[in-house]
Amino acid sequence: MAMYTNQTAEELETWRCTSDGIFKSQNSIWMKINFVFVFILIFLTFYLSFKAARVLKNHNVYSKGSQILLMITLLNANLNQLIFLEIRIRHLVHIFINSEDPCKIEFHSPECTYDQTIYAFTSVMSTGLLSALTFDRFFALYASTVYVRNSKDSAYMLITVSIIVTVIVHIRTYGGVSRAGYVPSCTYPPQLSLNTYQVVNNAIFWIIMANCVLTIAVLLLNIYKDKRIKKSVFDTKTRYNSFENVLTTKAICSVTSTQFVFLSFSTAALAIIRTLEAGMSEEVFHINIQYINGGVYGNLSIPVLIYLKTNQCILQRRKSIDKMTNHTGTVDSHISSLKTAWET
């Protein structure tokens, strides 16, 4: 990536004028199309999040702890989209004002301190919350008795841990790093933080992959446990709680897996682009970077999945309750007939 070098902060400050490739990419029609495309995705996220939050609040089918975690995950996704929207609007205005001046079309990195900080923080926080959702399902499976009584406390603890870890990662990545130099957009990290930034991105990829694998494992164990309960336990409450655990884990597995898919897409696409960078113009490189931002797609998928999976859970829950009610009635009548036959 041409804009990142091994230069010192003092040397980066002298590079006021951007390269011809970056200048062309900023003024490209494809960059303007990307603005429209991203704005549509972000406003769609806001609209669908309203619907998802309403169904979560009014028709909750999850434990209180899972509900809280899903709400916070939804809130963080919207905050990340909101700050991304602000960054992109600033970017668009900046391009229009400075479209003819290659020495003004880039942002001085200190100008991006606040919005880039919030954007980076909420991006890492989304991974922390996905991990929290995974551990929520893990606790529900292996500490079910304690979890049922303390699911809210468990959620608050997991959220607190997510925030603390995110703060530590953020300080480790950006703490004490000079914001010298110029960047095409405020989504770009400070140039002198690139090495640590890449390490963190790679770590996030593997963490989400681990979350995905663990959630699938918990889901399979839940399904296995549910089948055993159906065969050997006839207490309606126990059977229903087992069914609820499977439903909730399926929903959360969908969210985690989808985030992994989008991050994988973003990471793989970026790796391919960097491999081909030598034979690619700088203009094309920087335009492509704008289209492979997995975060904006992942954020959109969260309200979509919460809304669809919650409604699906409501329908399955209703069918299960009807089935269990009918089954209970059949068992009761069968036992009554056996008692009558025994007495006679």
UniProtKB/Swiss-Prot annotation:
GO MF, one annotated term: G protein-coupled receptor activity
A GO-annotated cellular component: membrane
Membrane-crossing residue ranges in chain numbering: 28-48, 67-87, 128-148, 157-177, 203-223, 252-272, 287-307
Subcellular location: Membrane
Gene3D superfamilies listed in its UniProt record: Rhodopsin 7-helix transmembrane proteins (1.20.1070.10)
Keyword hit for Ion transport: no
Keywords, alphabetical: Membrane, Transmembrane, Transmembrane helix
GO biological process: sensory perception of chemical stimulus
Family: Belongs to the nematode receptor-like protein sra family.
The protein's name: Serpentine receptor class alpha-27
Organism name: Caenorhabditis elegans
Gene name, Swiss-Prot/TrEMBL: sra-27
